[in-house]
Amino acid sequence: MPAQRLDGRQLAAQLEEVMAAAIASGLPRAGRPPGLAVLRVGDDPASGVYVANKEKACARVGLVSHGAHLDAATPQAEIEAKLRQLNQDPAVDGILVQLPVPAGLDDRALLLELDPAKDADGLHPLNLGRLLRGEPGPRSCTPAGVMALLRSNGIDPAGKRAVVIGRSILVGQPMALMLQAANATVTVVHSRTADLAAHTREAEILVVAAGKPGMIGADHVRPGAAVVDVGIHRKPEGGLCGDVRSAEVEPIASALSPVPGGVGPMTVTMLLLNTVRAWSQRFDLPDPTPGY
């Protein structure tokens, strides 16, 4: 039987509809729509595409996008001053620093300048600490998108063995914390793990965020596992691929996220959701998507 398709595009569209309705109903009380500021430094082409996609998503749900594009030669102090300005802007509810930033800039120092309440990407150390403590706050977008995909497809992590490949602060570490909070038994493996396949074959839920095209094949996957592919890479011959060799894995997995169309759309949706939630809390409005 083919693996269940973990369709991020479909779920993202559903959540966008819910957010659009929540914004429309909250406007009379709030007096303005939610605002998301995306700070981009330099002219990295991939970052330009990502920012354009986020702006389109904002328009679909009724958020105002406050773009801030600075030259690659902009000094660190000037960028930090711009972030402090956005922190004080009453029309801005969420702020995202588009990563990566140009060489020579300290992205960690930039993230520290964010008002944690406006941290749309969930990467401020205070918000990561809240995640560790199980306290409410903005959540890292990609792991939160993975959890939403699992939940919406009836995959409950409770009591299951979950393995996360990758230990980055962007995906791997918060992913492990979210799965643990959902009562999974979690193992994190990485580039220095001996006999990787011995660990991954134990996983009932396998989240792959290794950043290596086609790293995971059928020999890494337990039959019946739910496999979430976070990776996305451009192939030399054109098109996109993930960290998972999907043609091999699809026949043996119970569920598999496609690339593209799986985790990627959910990352953008969770960015919007963090912003809409911050706006809702500011004006004492109901949570737009309880459970997500």
From Swiss-Prot:
GO molecular function per UniProt: methenyltetrahydrofolate cyclohydrolase activity; methylenetetrahydrofolate dehydrogenase (NADP+) activity
Query: What GO CC annotations are associated with the protein?
Result: cytosol
What InterPro entries does this protein map onto? Aminoacid_DH-like_N_sf, NAD(P)-bd_dom_sf, THF_DH/CycHdrlase, THF_DH/CycHdrlase_cat_dom, THF_DH/CycHdrlase_CS, THF_DH/CycHdrlase_NAD-bd_dom
Quote the pathway field: One-carbon metabolism; tetrahydrofolate interconversion
What is the E.C. number? 1.5.1.5, 3.5.4.9
Q: Name one Pfam family in it.
A: THF_DHG_CYH
Q: Name one GO biological process term.
A: L-histidine biosynthetic process
Say yes or no: keyword Amino-acid biosynthesis present.
Answer: yes
Q: Assembly state and interactors?
A: Homodimer.
According to its UniProt entry, what is the function of this protein? Catalyzes the oxidation of 5,10-methylenetetrahydrofolate to 5,10-methenyltetrahydrofolate and then the hydrolysis of 5,10-methenyltetrahydrofolate to 10-formyltetrahydrofolate.
* Family according to the record: Belongs to the tetrahydrofolate dehydrogenase/cyclohydrolase family.
Q: What is this protein called?
A: Bifunctional protein FolD
Q: Which organism is it from?
A: Synechococcus sp. (strain RCC307)
